[in-house]
Amino acid sequence: MFLTGSGFTNDDEETFDPDSLKNYQEEYKSTSVGVCSTSSTKVYEDYRLITSVSSAQYQYIHNHMTVDEKTGFLLNEDGFIGVAMGYLFGEIGTEYYIELDTGVTIPVVKVDAKAAVDATNGCSANHDASVIEFVIDSDIAYAYFGGNNGLVSNGNFNNQDDFSGNIQDIRLVSDEKIEDGVLYEARPDTLKKSDETADAFQPVLGGYSK
């Protein structure tokens, strides 16, 4: 499964344990792109709403992401967690390390684009200042994380200790591994952004193998 060789230390390599973020080991070289917002807000969207088959979002999710059956997060072959981000963060398939002020690093991959009308500065959402929106299966996630208002984690993953904290740095991940400097050619090419701008998601057909 995806956790094998993905930078996570986890007793159960078949599923993603959020607590493993505390011991996450970065595998790829990265370059800081600065912080456009330090917001701690971390909202979510359900991936099953993307329906445009021709969009880069749909194609990337369909071909490179797997729904974790424990937490409902979507993860790619590198173990990066699927999120929606603004236009400042490039094309679909671009990977980042999100460093929090708690010392935790969250590896994310842009699988959907925040609509420009909803994030006019290209970074944070106008209505809640969130920089990242986790792309999840909300049914699985609700069963795992819970919530008191009908929303997963009451609508904000910052309510979860493992994800709590303000953004301290955002680093663009390269194809070059830290330990050996060899290009990891098996990683998927970044896809071109489509005209689809809705913050929405669609079912996954792909999967990982050991």
Which residues fall in each region the model found?
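Solvent-exposed, well-ordered loop and adjacent helix/strand elements within mature globular domains
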Residues: F16-K210
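Sec-dependent N-terminal signal peptides of Gram-positive bacterial secreted proteins and lipoproteins
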Residues: M1-T9
